[in-house]
Amino acid sequence: MSRIGKKPIPVPSGVTASIEGQLIKAKGPKGELSYIVNDEVLVKLEDNIVSVTPRDQSKDARSKWGMSHSMIRNIFCGVKDGFEKKLEISGVGYRAALQGKNIQLSLGFSHDVVYKVPSDVSVAVPKPTEIVVSGIDKQKVGQIAAEIRGYRGPEPYKGKGIKYVDESLVRKEGKKK
């Protein structure tokens, strides 16, 4: 079992943190985030160090302990540096373009796919075959990147489709005669 929750979480420089009951708020140069910690977990802020402890030694409390630690660390990283996911489009005629706040994707369908981007996440298209999703909330950035990838995931034979830049594809061999 991982003991990630035992490590104290230092509040980064440039970030202010406050705890009100089970609500922890972080404010930094990129914005402001808050997280409601589960009732099974106690959170304390002392001298710019956040410590997370389970209320008791039940299995549920210990599992929420590590998750709460990771979520608090992620909101600190998000308001300080932000998060970013890069997507790569490969395939003949597959491309992306930015239309105001929306992304227009040409993915080999009979129509173009238009994805509406939420206001708290920014999307850039530096090249027609590259999409960069960035924001302060790690969950939302990952969710939007996964939704865009879901329109045309990479296929195993030619590798056409949308994939993460750091994703490795398992390629298959075509059938033999």
From Swiss-Prot:
Signal peptide: none annotated. GO terms for biological process: cytoplasmic translation. Disulfide bonds: none annotated. Keywords: Ribonucleoprotein, Ribosomal protein, RNA-binding, rRNA-binding. One of its GO terms (cellular component) is cytosolic large ribosomal subunit. InterPro entries: Ribosomal_uL6-like (IPR000702), Ribosomal_uL6-like_a/b-dom_sf (IPR036789), Ribosomal_uL6_a/b-dom (IPR020040), Ribosomal_uL6_bac-type (IPR019906), Ribosomal_uL6_CS (IPR002358). GO terms for molecular function: rRNA binding; structural constituent of ribosome. The keyword Ribosomal protein applies. SUPFAM superfamilies: Ribosomal protein L6 (SSF56053). Transmembrane segments: none annotated. Part of the 50S ribosomal subunit. This protein binds to the 23S rRNA, and is important in its secondary structure. It is located near the subunit interface in the base of the L7/L12 stalk, and near the tRNA binding site of the peptidyltransferase center. Belongs to the universal ribosomal protein uL6 family. This is Large ribosomal subunit protein uL6.
